[in-house]
Regions:
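Membrane-water interface regions at transmembrane-helix termini and the short interhelical loops
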Residues: 17, 21, 50, 123-149, ...
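Helix-loop-helix junctions that connect adjacent transmembrane segments
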Residues: 28, 111-115, 144-280
């Protein structure tokens, strides 16, 4: 469950996005965010998940149980609709990841027309719905493999980056590197980027619908949230510093948000004399990770919408599930709306 939550909450690309926005000052921002948001929010989710451990709607079940059925229904629809663009973005990232995994560069997506990119993104949706429908426990398998590999690759990047820093005599691409480099200037520009930090580490409530599948949810679910907080702290703080070793935070590439993760592992491999080996390993890791994220998002947001919403608010055909308890018609609704957004 911790790896499923890790998949929805944080990834290497989330670190890259905010490094692009704030540079090395993002280290301080991550520390503040951990204590002011990540840890308290994870503990709240852990507590609510352990209390409402027999309901399968997650956030919508919590609101329904505390504020009434209508607000529970309103929460379910609102959260589902707000998550659809994120699902589309995750499917896009799967296509980008395959491009890097096969070509070792960004040529695949750069030479593709918008229509072709949209087509392959839609194909990704169809494949995932087919897999979810026919392969039992596919989401759990993808989450374990994708989340585990991404965490391992992050640890590998951080450890090798610090080893490379010592090997090079302390030379960093970010110069000058002083205490002032990591202290943000709390102006309007800074505050306008804080929302991206929250967006990056948000999402642990998505795995709440699976609390009903745990053997001892009252004890195990809070533990999963605590483990998630520790993993997030390591990835955000040390990962951001490691990026400053290979990228000059004062002069960053324009396409860092889309391709920065691949540039980082390529630079790491070249420093250690293995060429693009690390980059290719990361590319396939990213594909598995984004596939896991897409699977969890499709399933969790649909369950949140359908699993514990009052019958008078939810049409019967949407509440229909297959023999494994999967809301297939809900998947199709999500896929249809995603296709509309892409078009």
């Amino acid at each position: 469950l911790t790896l499923m939550a890790f998949v929805t909450v944080i990834g290497f690309d989330d670190i890259m996005y905010n490094f692009q926005n704030q540079g090395m000052t993002v280290i301080t921002s991550w520390i503040l965010m951990l204590f002011l948001y990540v840890i308290p929010y994870s503990l709240m989710v852990g507590h609510l998940g352990s209390v409402f451990n027999h309901e399968g709607g997650g956030l919508s079940s919590w609101i329904r149980g505390t504020k009434g059925e209508f607000l529970g229904y309103f929460t379910a629809w609102t959260y589902w609709a707000a998550s659809v663009p994120y699902v589309v973005d995750s499917a896009n990232s799967v296509v980008v990841g395959f491009g890097w995994a096969f070509t070792g560069s960004n040529k695949f997506q750069d030479t593709m027309s918008n229509a072709s990119f949209t087509f392959w993104t839609f194909v990704t949706f169809v494949i995932f719905i087919f897999i979810q429908h026919h392969l039992k426990n596919s989401m759990e398998i993808l989450s374990t493999i994708g989340g585990g590999m991404m965490f391992i690759m992050t640890i590998l990047f951080v450890l090798l980056a610090f080893f490379g820093l010592a090997k090079s005599g302390g030379h960093m691409a970010t110069q000058p590197m002083t205490w002032h480099t990591i202290i943000p200037k709390f102006d309007l520009k800074y505050w306008s980027t804080v929302g991206m930090l929250i967006y990056a580490v948000n999402g642990c409530e998505l795995i709440a619908p699976y609390v009903t599948q745990m053997k001892n949810p009252r004890r195990e679910f809070p533990k999963a949230m605590i483990a998630l907080s520790v993993m997030t702290a390591f990835l955000t703080i040390f990962g951001s510093f490691a990026l400053g070793i290979y990228f000059n935070a004062y002069h960053l590439p324009n396409d860092l948000k889309m391709n920065g993760s691949y540039y980082a592992f390529s630079a790491l491999g070249k420093q250690f004399g293995v060429g693009n080996l690390f980059m290719y390993i990361y590319a396939w890791t990213s594909v598995l990770y984004m596939c896991a994220l897409l699977a969890v998002l499709l399933d969790a947001m649909t369950r949140m919408l359908i699993s514990d919403t009052g019958e008078k608010y939810m049409p019967k055909f949407l509440r229909k599930t297959n023999k494994d308890g999967l809301p297939i018609n809900g998947y199709l609704l999500t896929c249809g709306l995603s296709a509309f957004i892409m078009l």
